[in-house]
Amino acid sequence: YIAFLFWGLLCKVSDDVQFRLEQAVYERMSLEDRMTGLKNRKAFEQSVNKIQKEAALLENVLLLFIEIDGLKKINDTYGLQRGDEAVIRTARSIRPVENGSYEQQVQCFRIEGDEFAVIVSNPQKTPAEWERFIKDELKKETTDGNRVCLKFGYSYLRKTDGTLVSISDWKMQADQMLLLNKEKMFHCLFCNIFN
């Protein structure tokens, strides 16, 4: 009888462990972009919410928005496979930033089809240095002559005088700078997009 009870308890514990492992896998999958392996928009919003709660404790936080220039044109002209390649190359150029090869406390996200975000807590590098690093990584990814052009926008959580901006203003400022850069660079002179 005791052996039967022990067996039942062991089976129950085993089922509970398996359920928890599966639940952890599904949770991780719900926060990851399948195509790129980067965190997705849901994970981005969770990180932003955490930053909002901890903002007073943070020295500063840099938000970079990155967009692939002309992804729709690539898709329409050369097909979805080429567009997917552009997205994957961009993600691979952003990933080293998160993997500690550049700075600590960095998170990278694919937040929409052609849009990415990078959040840097207590940044040591300027936005221009980040942009240069990511573009250099993208050049390494471009071995077949099919170049991808990126546009950048950024915002700091703290103004130069140290006061905090609201989370919505923080995101809006980065988005507005991205749009401004998009207008300035109507045609990307640096890159030929998928010749």
What annotation goes with each model-predicted range?
Residues 187-195:
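Intrinsically disordered, glycine/charged-rich C-terminal tails and inter-domain linkers
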Residues 31, 40-62, 69-96, 109-113, ...:
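Conserved long alpha-helical elements within nucleotide-processing catalytic cores of c-di-GMP signaling
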Residues 89-159:
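GGDEF/GGEEF active-site signature
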Residues 34, 52, 56, 98-102, ...:
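Secondary-structure transition/hinge residues
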Residues 57-59, 102, 160-164:
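Short, solvent-exposed loop/turn segments that connect beta-strands within catalytic domains
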Residues 1-34, 42-52, 102-104:
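Signal-transducing coiled-coil linker helices
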